[in-house]
Structures are given as structure tokens and as C-alpha cells.
């Protein structure tokens, strides 16, 4: 015979089983990230940890940004002052450098998953609970996500979060906030520029706000660099980090299975010198073709179509540009999860996309060998598949 207290507990558990299960799942995802905190790879040993230790030695938030910091091989740090300042804050806590670096990215894992839920709730109000929960669980346990932040210690999820927040604001037509959040993403990492083609198209097609709003991007970035300016760094120093990133790599691909890997394995500088400007030109042309078709066919700027457009333009930019790292697809891969919740026919493409990225991460983390040409061809097939399915969806006369 049950006592009343026991019955109340059982009733509570039954009535809140969905929330309890979700909480348990999220706790398990935290546990996964915790178990890999010890892992060190070349990026952590040669770059991230030396940067962290130098920032701490220079005074943390009270001087850690006052002078250049260097990697193990003597290369000057090419991560933004905004990211460096976050490391400076962490340096004042009693935590190992490696754990602090990973903790920062893991915090943004969870901010990003809840921003995903917020976007999906807006896009699919009739199934917002079911779809948003599925997306949160998939993101929480996605190997690419926790490998990037908790295993690798990289910060791609940080600028990804701010890009998603910017996209959310544009969906809600809060344009100034959208530009401010995009400015924060850009302040963290130059790779936020992959989202810029969508913003330019959105501005041109929407005609709802002034081009002056684009000034909010550099203004926001400069405001976030105030801690560095206070410590003696200059605007020239800020700009040099971005320009240094564009000139650092001299091979056609840095691990990402780009279009150009179909004809060049990316290991020789000769391929880079002969294809660099061709690749940039083809990227611009591919972006222009997408935009032209949407304009000529009068594709409606519905919320769902905006997400499709943002995804395709970001994917196009990364796929055709030279010198892309394997991690640079992170933003469009997260957008692909949103699209999967909108359009379940993209499931095979999403699984293929995730598998390719896992193979690339295996190379970066564990030196696993793979056929780069085969991966590039597979990525091309997935790109074409997404282009076809989403174009078919967008070109329907009725709005969704």
C-alpha cells in the first residue's frame, strides 16, 4: 500500500516525465564533456595552452592583452582580443588552462542548443515542443559538437552562437539587434564572415532597413575590443589579427573537403598559387547564381526560406573558398540541424554531412587517414542534394 507522500512523488514524476528525461539527458551530455577534459591535441599543446599561460603571466585582465602572445613555435597569436580577454578572465580562477579553455566553449554549447530551440519554436509553432526537444538532444550528443569544444578545445561554437542569435533577430525583424549580435560574432572570429553573403542578400531583397546598419558590425567589434585598447593595443593590432588570418595558409585546403580537393589534394603550395584567385572568383559566382535565381523567381522571404538561404550561402562560401579548415563548416552544419527539423527529407544529407565532418575531425584529432578526393566528391554530392531539395522547397508558389 502506497503512502500519500510516495503517491505524490510518483504523480509528480509521471506528470513531469518529459522535463525530467530532458534534464537527465542534458546531465549525461555534461558528463560526456567532462570525461574528455584531459584530452590534449597539437592545437592545445602548441597554441591554446601557451597563449593562456602567457596571458595569465602578463596579468590576466589587468595586462594579459598588453603585448603579443606566441605559440610554441613562436607564431604570434591569431585569435581575437575578445577571445583572449575571455581567457584572461578565466586565468584568475583556480582551474587548469586546458580545462578553462574547454569550459568556455562548453558553456556556449548549451547556450547554442537553447538558441536552436528558440529558433525552431519560432519556425514551427505547431510542433515547437517536440521539434525543439529533438534538436536540443541531437545537438547535445552530436559528436561534432562535443569533439569541437570539449575534446579539441576550439571556439567555433562561440561565434556560431552569436550568428544564430543574429539570424533569430533578423527572423523577428529586429535588424539593429541582428547586426549587433553579428558584430559580436565577428569580434570573436573572422570566420563569422561566412554569414555575410546572406546579410548582403537580405539587405538587398528585403529593403526594410538602411545600409548604415552595417556600420553596427565594426562598431560593435571595436567596443568589444575596449579592454585591449585600455591595455595599450591599437586598432592596427586588431586589424592585423584578421589580415594575418587571411594570409596565413598557403595550401588550397586545411582539412576541409572543398570543391578544389577534387583536383588537388591540398598538400602542395603549387596548387594554392594556381587556384587561389580562381577559387575566390568561383565562390563569388556561385553565390551570385543562388541570389540571382531567388531574385528572378521571386522567392518569398518567409522565415523558413530565410533559414534555407542562410544555410546555402554559408555552405557555398565555405565549400568553394580556398584554405578552409575542417572546422569552418560548423555554422552551416548547425543550421542543417534546424533545416532537418523543418524538412525531414534532408535526413540522409544531414547524416552524410555529419559523417564527413567526423572523418575530418578524426584526421585533426587522431591523425586518421582518409581519401581527400573521395571526401570532396561526397561533400559535392551533399551540396548538390541540399541545393536541389531546398530550391525545390523555396520555389513553390505557395508560402509555408
Predicted regions and their residues:
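Start-transfer (signal-anchor) and selected internal transmembrane alpha helices
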Residues: 1-35, 107, 121-122, 132-134, ...
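Aromatic/glycine/proline-enriched transmembrane-helix motif characteristic
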Residues: 13, 17-20, 113, 122, ...
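Specific aromatic-rich, kink-prone transmembrane helix
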Residues: 115, 158-175, 335-336
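Extracytosolic helix-loop segments that constitute the early lumenal/periplasmic catalytic or substrate-binding loops
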Residues: 47-78, 82, 92, 232-242
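Transmembrane signal-anchor helices characteristic of membrane glycosylation enzymes that use polyprenol
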Residues: 14-50, 59, 106-109, 141, ...
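Loop-to-helix entry region of an early transmembrane alpha helix in multi-pass inner-membrane enzymes
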Residues: 81, 85, 95-114, 270-281
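Perimembrane helix-loop-helix junctions
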Residues: 2-3, 8, 194-219, 230-231, ...
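Transmembrane helical bundles and short interhelical boundary loops of multi-pass, membrane-embedded
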Residues: 2-3, 35-41, 238-257, 292, ...
Amino acid at each position: 500500500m502506497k503512502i500519500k507522500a510516495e503517491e505524490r512523488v510518483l504523480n509528480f514524476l509521471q506528470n513531469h516525465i518529459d522535463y525530467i528525461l530532458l534534464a537527465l539527458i542534458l546531465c549525461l551530455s555534461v558528463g560526456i564533456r567532462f570525461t574528455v577534459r584531459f584530452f590534449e591535441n597539437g592545437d592545445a599543446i602548441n597554441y591554446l595552452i601557451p597563449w593562456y599561460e602567457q596571458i595569465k603571466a602578463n596579468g590576466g585582465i589587468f595586462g594579459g592583452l598588453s603585448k603579443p602572445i606566441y605559440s610554441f613555435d613562436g607564431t604570434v597569436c591569431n585569435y581575437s582580443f575578445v577571445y583572449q580577454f575571455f581567457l584572461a578572465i578565466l586565468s584568475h580562477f583556480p582551474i587548469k588552462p586546458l580545462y578553462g579553455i574547454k569550459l568556455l566553449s562548453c558553456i556556449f554549447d548549451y547556450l547554442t542548443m537553447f538558441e536552436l530551440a528558440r529558433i525552431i519554436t519560432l519556425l514551427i509553432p505547431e510542433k515547437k515542443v517536440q521539434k525543439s526537444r529533438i534538436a536540443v538532444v541531437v545537438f547535445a550528443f552530436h559528436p561534432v559538437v562535443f569533439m569541437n569544444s570539449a575534446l579539441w578545445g576550439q571556439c567555433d561554437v562561440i561565434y556560431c552562437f552569436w550568428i544564430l542569435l543574429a539570424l533569430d533577430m533578423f527572423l523577428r525583424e529586429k535588424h539593429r539587434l541582428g547586426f549587433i549580435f553579428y558584430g559580436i560574432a565577428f569580434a570573436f572570429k573572422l570566420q563569422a564572415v561566412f554569414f555575410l553573403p546572406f546579410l548582403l542578400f537580405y539587405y538587398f531583397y528585403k529593403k526594410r532597413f538602411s545600409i548604415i546598419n552595417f556600420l553596427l558590425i565594426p562598431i560593435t567589434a571595436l567596443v568589444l575590443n575596449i579592454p585591449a585598447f585600455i591595455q595599450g593595443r591599437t586598432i592596427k593590432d586588431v586589424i592585423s589579427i584578421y589580415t594575418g588570418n587571411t594570409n596565413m595558409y598557403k595550401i588550397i585546403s586545411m582539412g576541409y573537403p572543398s570543391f578544389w580537393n577534387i583536383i588537388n589534394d591540398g598538400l602542395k603550395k603549387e596548387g594554392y598559387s594556381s587556384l587561389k584567385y580562381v577559387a575566390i572568383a568561383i565562390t563569388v559566382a556561385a553565390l551570385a547564381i543562388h541570389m540571382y535565381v531567388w531574385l528572378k523567381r521571386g522567392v518569398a522571404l518567409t522565415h523558413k526560406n530565410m533559414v534555407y538561404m542562410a544555410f546555402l550561402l554559408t555552405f557555398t562560401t565555405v565549400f568553394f573558398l580556398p584554405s578552409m579548415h575542417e572546422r569552418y563548416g560548423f555554422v552551416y552544419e548547425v543550421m542543417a540541424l534546424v533545416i532537418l527539423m523543418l524538412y525531414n527529407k534532408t535526413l540522409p544529407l544531414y547524416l552524410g554531412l555529419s559523417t564527413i565532418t567526423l572523418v575530418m575531425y578524426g584526421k585533426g584529432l587522431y591523425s586518421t587517414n582518409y581519401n581527400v578526393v573521395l571526401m570532396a566528391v561526397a561533400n559535392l554530392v551533399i551540396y548538390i542534394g541540399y541545393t536541389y531539395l531546398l530550391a525545390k522547397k523555396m520555389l513553390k508558389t505557395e508560402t509555408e
